[in-house]
Amino acid sequence: MTLPVWVAAAARAATEALLGRPFSASQLLELPDRDEPLAVSVTSAAVLAGGEQALAISHCDPGSGLDLTRGLEIWVCVQWQELVDDELNVHSEAWLNLLAGKGVGTLGSGGEACVSRFARELLSRNLYPLVPSGRGLQLEVVLPRGRDLAARTSNAAFGVVDGLALIGTQADVQVSASPDQLQQTIEQLRRQSAASDFCGAMTLVIGENGLDLARQLGLAAQPLLKIGNWLGPVIVAAAEAGVEQLLLLGYHGKLVKLAGGIFHTHHHLADGRLEVLAAMAVREGLPLDLIRQLGQADSMEAALKMLEAQDPELVRKLWYRLAVTVEHRSAAYLARYGSWSIAIGAALFDRQRRLRWAGPQGSQQLAVLGVTPEDSPISLSLP
């Protein structure tokens, strides 16, 4: 189950404790995307502050897939709040005051909790029937390990800071590393390429964040396909389906893996990002001391900031080389499985949601769509 489901279960258990009801380790939840209630386990619940507050704890279980939220401890603290007449309706949403506690991502520093519409509807369905007439509910979610885990995601690239976002569009986890998810993606690709108005060009975007950015950039003039971590097989499937212009759009921390020949990008299965970056730095002729610092950086973002502070122009060359290498390695990967007439372009964005770099093919394909990367490679040349 996705993170919002486990939050809702703990929230319901805490609200029941606030009402003085006995603890139930199994909470029946009404789900927006299911006809039947779902039983979700909760670890504990208790009243605090002389009965003025209640706290419940659950532990996230995303199922059989590889997910960094596995075992994540979730705390939900609730208390009543008084409402005025026009706030009493469930449709006003004012009855529920959702606070982002420690480890929960917010939209900018000190902003609102980053919560999906599905998560809000889930909370509303399962908590509103418990709230006494004339009262509202203040609900604070705390994820003790949320901030540490968020550092391993690209949340910051999309304005989400200080923790994990409570996102999800359904109860079940969509496992981007699973064979079933790969098959679903390939079937969708075949449907898009078989459409009567298909012009031969397609953009593959990595994850929901990449899809959102692609739409903002105006790339929806050609088919957009959100993919998970199986980049290699999807590239082959695109060639088999007759795609002639394929654009790979992704966060630099993901696409850098392709430059190292890693075409299944889930972090549990393959990483090597800093090693690939260091190898590119060697080929670009960076000083040895700087290359050592790259290899010792805590993250891709830290490495990028360090380089930009020392030599912004060198960063442009390095990342252009990386984008070119992504295109070359993708073409080489495809050539192992057959011979097709397809141009593969690469375009990379950074944590600030800026489209920064593209290889030669990527730049050409973006230009057709009226988009130009911030760091244009036009003046750069590679040995």
Curated annotation (Swiss-Prot):
Top EC class, one word: transferase
One GO BP annotation of this record: methylation
Lineage top rank: taxon: Bacteria
Catalytic activity reported: Co-precorrin-5B + S-adenosyl-L-methionine = Co-precorrin-6A + S-adenosyl-L-homocysteine
Known EC number: 2.1.1.195
Keywords noted in UniProt: Cobalamin biosynthesis, Methyltransferase, S-adenosyl-L-methionine, Transferase
Pathway: Cofactor biosynthesis; adenosylcobalamin biosynthesis; cob(II)yrinate a,c-diamide from sirohydrochlorin (anaerobic route): step 6/10
Pfam families noted in UniProt: CbiD
InterPro entries: CbiD (IPR002748), CbiD_sf (IPR036074)
Residue pairs linked by disulfide bridges in the UniProt entry: none
GO MF assignments: cobalt-precorrin-5B C1-methyltransferase activity
Family annotation (HAMAP family): CbiD
Recorded family membership: Belongs to the CbiD family.
Official protein name in the record: Cobalt-precorrin-5B C(1)-methyltransferase
Species of provenance: Prochlorococcus marinus (strain MIT 9313)
Gene that encodes the chain: cbiD
